[in-house]
Amino acid sequence: MITGKIVQIIGAVVDVEFSQQSVPKIFNALKVDNQGSILILEVQQQLGSGIVRTIAMGSSNGLKRGLLVVDLEHGIKVPVGTATLGRIVNVLGQPIDMKGPLKNHDNSDIEYWEIHRKAPSYSEQLTSYEVLETGIKVIDLICPFSKGGKVGLFGGAGVGKTVNMMELIRNIATEHSGYSVFTGVGERTREGNDFYHEMSDSRVLDKVSLVYGQMNEPPGNRLRVAFTGLTIAEKFRNEGHDVLLFIDNIYRYTLAGTEVSALLGRIPSAVGYQPTLSEEMGVLQERITSTNKGSITSIQAVYVPADDLTDPSPATTFSHLDSTITLSRQIVSLGIYPAIDPLNSTSRQLDPRIVGQLHYDVALGVRSILQRYQELKDIIAILGMDELSEDDKILVSRARKIQKFLSQPFFVAEIFTGFSGKYVKLQDTINGFKDIIEGKVDHVPEQAFYMVGSINEVIEKSKKL
């Protein structure tokens, strides 16, 4: 047993001295008894003379110099497999849902994996062109997801990232038979609680593993909790399952890295972020991939500070994604939810060879009408609608109907909106927007398109107006 002693404590950073012959490796887990409770430290730096600098995976309150520290001689290990399904665990894999210890259904031994693992090699990786239906019109039409791909939900504060994330989980987890892993990185405890009950009410909790590191936790927890969730997802993938990995919020992972970097004494780079921002993001994102054994489809919420998409944190995330969904405050102000901006949202899947020519043409038609409407808005604001040509008047009418039709009542928001949730099949979505573009519903009033599912519901609603 290799032991050392604490020589310095600065908040979440703890320096530990070992003999020079037995200095722990980087990322090794150390154990210290802090007034009867076990605290885990993770080695971040070797300072020389046998001293290592560590980050505490919990509160450092109560620690003092001279306390005995034990090197566990491996990285942080967490439980993986079916024992985690339906349970909430923390960064160390310890259950925090007050349901007792984790156990496998067949009472077999629980397997433990280290959270620091190598990304799959190039020869093991697999790409898929299969489109994953979400039941949300604007996503399925404009920025379709690929099975085994990575999706980012970008948005500032209060534009609906978490609600969109919860709706996606509810829709995909209900329709999709595989396992899901939800990782809450530095988010509100209330949202975690809401999410747990939403999964329970939707009867999909027994297929979901929940890993939480809330915003009141020390930076070490928030920095590593994404790896805990990813490790659980990797286990399911390696067993041949198609896994959904939800991360809310990837920005908090970056922020925790910034805090840890400052505590470790590194000189900050642009906008105060850590100099290792790209590397830290890459280490996480490179492991989120599909292999010849199974797939991981990842959906990540990304907070955009001050609605600035050029901020280094969201900008670094962009390069790793297959689909980007941008939430717009301007669309929120129009009362249209989900507030997804169809002109700023993209997907590599929107290709006629993948989604088919009809889907591609309809998506492009919707975009071009909305783009032209955007250009005409200034003329309308200054001169009014009367100055537009007849063709432009028709185009504006269709654009406003498209805008309204892009709204959709969510299952997870029923309690707030009063509208019952709708799941819209991809074919119904394409047919609905095709009818608007071709002018088949020009006679239907604009209000009928708001907060409905398919185009048939629009016709029914218009009869009541």
From Swiss-Prot:
Subcellular location: Cell membrane
Enzyme Commission no: 7.1.2.2
Any GO MF annotation of the entry: proton-transporting ATP synthase activity, rotational mechanism
Gene3D superfamilies, per the entry: 2.40.10.170, Bovine Mitochondrial F1-atpase, Atp Synthase Beta Chain, Chain D, domain 3, P-loop containing nucleotide triphosphate hydrolases
Enzyme class: translocase
Superkingdom of this protein's organism: Bacteria
Cleavable signal peptide: none
Record's GO cellular component terms: plasma membrane; proton-transporting ATP synthase complex
Reactions accelerated catalytically: ATP + H2O + 4 H(+)(in) = ADP + phosphate + 5 H(+)(out)
Protein's membrane topology: Peripheral membrane protein
Binding positions for ATP per the UniProt entry: G155, G156, A157, G158, V159, G160, K161, T162
Entry-linked InterPro entries: AAA+_ATPase, ATP-synt_VA_C, ATP_synth_F1_bsu, ATPase_a/bsu_AS, ATPase_alpha/beta_chains, ATPase_F1/V1/A1_a/bsu_N, ATPase_F1/V1/A1_a/bsu_N_sf, ATPase_F1/V1/A1_a/bsu_nucl-bd
Keywords: ATP synthesis, ATP-binding, Cell membrane, CF(1), Hydrogen ion transport, Ion transport, Membrane, Nucleotide-binding, Translocase, Transport
Keyword RNA-binding tagged: no
SUPFAM superfamilies associated with the record: C-terminal domain of alpha and beta subunits of F1 ATP synthase, N-terminal domain of alpha and beta subunits of F1 ATP synthase, P-loop containing nucleoside triphosphate hydrolases
The protein's assembly and partners: F-type ATPases have 2 components, CF(1) - the catalytic core - and CF(0) - the membrane proton channel. CF(1) has five subunits: alpha(3), beta(3), gamma(1), delta(1), epsilon(1). CF(0) has three main subunits: a(1), b(2) and c(9-12). The alpha and beta chains form an alternating ring which encloses part of the gamma chain. CF(1) is attached to CF(0) by a central stalk formed by the gamma and epsilon chains, while a peripheral stalk is formed by the delta and b chains.
PANTHER family found in the cross-reference section: ATP SYNTHASE, ATP SYNTHASE SUBUNIT BETA, MITOCHONDRIAL
Family according to the record: Belongs to the ATPase alpha/beta chains family.
Its job: Produces ATP from ADP in the presence of a proton gradient across the membrane. The catalytic sites are hosted primarily by the beta subunits.
Protein name as annotated: ATP synthase subunit beta
Species in which this protein is naturally found: Buchnera aphidicola subsp. Baizongia pistaciae (strain Bp)
Higher taxonomy: Bacteria, Pseudomonadati, Pseudomonadota, Gammaproteobacteria, Enterobacterales
